[in-house]
From Swiss-Prot:
Presence of keyword Ligase: yes
Native source species: Dinoroseobacter shibae (strain DSM 16493 / NCIMB 14021 / DFL 12)
Class of the enzyme per the UniProt entry, highest EC level: ligase
Reaction equation(s) it catalyzes: L-cysteine + L-glutamate + ATP = gamma-L-glutamyl-L-cysteine + ADP + phosphate + H(+)
Gene3D superfamilies the record matches: 3.30.590.20
EC number from the UniProt entry: 6.3.2.2
Keyword Membrane carried by entry: no
Record's protein name: Putative glutamate--cysteine ligase 2
Molecular-function GO terms, alphabetical: ATP binding; glutamate-cysteine ligase activity
Residues in coiled coil: none
Amino acid sequence: MSTPEFTLGIEEEYLLVDRDSLQLAEAPEALMAACRDKLEGQVSPEFLQCQIEIGTGVCAEIAEARADLRKLRSTVAAEAARFNLAPIAASCHPSADWAEQHHTDKDRYNDLEKDLGGVARRLLICGMHVHVGLDDDDLRIDLLPQFSYFLPHLLALSSSSPFWKGQDTGLASYRLTVFDNLPRTGLPPVFNSWAEYQRNIHVLIDLGLIEDSSKIWWDLRPSHNFPTLESRICDVCPRLEDTLSLAAATQALMRMLWGLKTHNMRWRAYDRFLISENRWRAQRYGARGSLIDFGRGAVVDSTELVEELIELIGADARALGGLAEVERLREIAADGSSADRQRAVRRAALEAGQSDAEAMNAVVRHLIEEFHRDL
């Protein structure tokens, strides 16, 4: 078995807000045209007109991904500013109402709205997807259930959507609550081979129910367009460095699992019922919560789990050039994710005598500042 390249690609979805009202704003065509001109196809509209999606190129290591992602974020921010707009990288706007948004008039999105109805119209959410290059088809299928064990860990550390329509949801990642209303979501099934995966997907394709595997929206999936495994579990992160830490961890986890395979070993694939419990705990409590360590048979705080994770994948992260980024996960576990920071901003605003609406606007200003901080 040849050694995979473990190339890296990162996709992020942003919301556009008016700098004065701090409410969502639709992307002007002139803004999209300017971004397309400067970013050569690395930016595109998303389902809703207030959203914008970017994607890095194929990166050999995390340093290359950092440079590309910083360029993408900087360009979008600079072009948006020309229209008195600002991007925010949070999975839900704190106070916006999905019913007031309009979807992008493209065949793909028109078909999606027609197919999914009101479920699609509620998709006022943004995510972050990480692709890791694995050329071997069967290897990608083999790693699906093994990597799934770690999906809740990544979700907890990325959580950035505590608010929905002006209310504190009590969750760290409300985005997942909205997204799970779609069909063909959640943890991936277990397949024994690439051929078995293809047979199952083609049942739906051959019946005309879906066009292709891009309509499969599992938390982790073989990409339809690239020879990659695509992790889709994460909320989008306001801070550039948080995104890079999670991407580096995803890349190192893939290499670690491949390394086990080369020694005729594998990570235990726990039942989806059990992984789903951790997925819920991550969704509910975020980076300052706790998850089940099934090997130990105990509920363990995130700070301790992150230490275990760094020990587990540290050598692989070093080999890939991303050890510093992976070690930075300690800061997220100790200080909290964006969901914790957003709640702290709102709490401080309310304690200062601001109204609920003013407090939510303070959260949006905070998200704008965090987006621009590392640029």
